[in-house]
Amino acid sequence: MQHRGDIAAWLRLQLTPGVGAVSTRRLLAAFSLPDQIFRQSQSALEAVVSEKQAKALLREPVGFSVALQNLEGWLNQNGQRFVALGDPDYPQSLLQSPDPPLCLYVQCADWQWWQLWAKEKQPPLLGMVGSRKPSPQGERTAQTWAKEITQSGFSVISGLALGVDAAAHKGALQAPAWGMGRSIAVVGTGLDVVYPRQHTQLAQEILNAGGAILSEFPLGTPAIATNFPKRNRIIAGLGLGVVVIEAALQSGSLITARLAMEANREVFALPGSIYSPQSQGCHALIKQGAQLVESAQEVIQALPPQSMLGVNFATNNIAFEADKKKSPEDPLSTVTQKSMLKKEKEKESQTTVLSKGSEKESPLLLALGFAPISLEALLLELSYSAAELQMELLQLELAGKVSRLPGGLYQRLI
């Protein structure tokens, strides 16, 4: 959709204050298209929405002219599109989700590839989400699995956030550029705003490799905490399923998992150590029916057969070794969405992977995780000499932070 009148009407509907998703669907059901909505009288509109909403629809939103001008300038650049409901390039999988966004802002250099999966759902897509502060094992697993999944012909969707999201995108980028399987980022800002800023280069690499970045939010939209759960429903709705890696109980990843379940998508969760705080969400999801998976190939093979068209299974079978803690009975009922959003806000406001409380922790303690690990693996992970490593391990053991296990293994305790 590149007609100025159509774009202007959709943008005006999106920017009209006080008219949310439910009211918008009622209006479109009654009048078909946005330009028809704005031709109605107040009384006709009030038959569908409230008086306040009807009056808002009859007024041009504040800043609309500037927003339209900015959008038109943005669309003049190659590979940038505006796709609204009813457009043939609108992803079919989103149309089949409970709450499809009104419109999408899209950056993609290979529009033929976009059209193929938007219309035919080929290649199939998989979401991958998780902690913004993953353990080294979790981060490696996300990257390795994303690479394997993408090399198998799937595309990987994530949210361009810190931690697991970034690892998933980087793993997908290790597959051949411009192949069938690529990296897709769904963001919670306008597409002219990269958040977090340190992922500006990563976003460009996704585009350079033929992938896509998309958002439902107008240009100029900053990083607002309440926008990220909305972003999560698109990740959940686009793919055949969602893989959750290292999610704490109050993680925003649980919102994505819940939305995926509501959209009748598959949900996969990786088990880990019962001693890791990062395991609570994954273990709770497994208790609620999410599929426990230990390799990327298990994820692919668990998907419906009709999604396998053109997929070339990877032969590698990478076992998962993660860090986790005891999980509660039911995270999605015992933890309210309000508390999840609060936690999401805290995480989105971070500009580094480490929290203030963990900045003083040694690289060794961070690398250990709660899953047993060998001295040899630690030497590969860190730039320590064997003597330095053994000395610091001894100090951590004496401090009660690390336990020495049989077989030359070590495990973090706190």
Question: Across the structure, where does each feature detected by a protein language model lie?
Answer:
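Glycine-biased, small-residue-rich flexible motifs in mid-sequence functional cores and linkers
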Residues: 1-6, 84-414
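Short, small/acidic-rich helices and loops at N termini and domain boundaries
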Residues: 1-89, 399-401, 407-408, 413-414
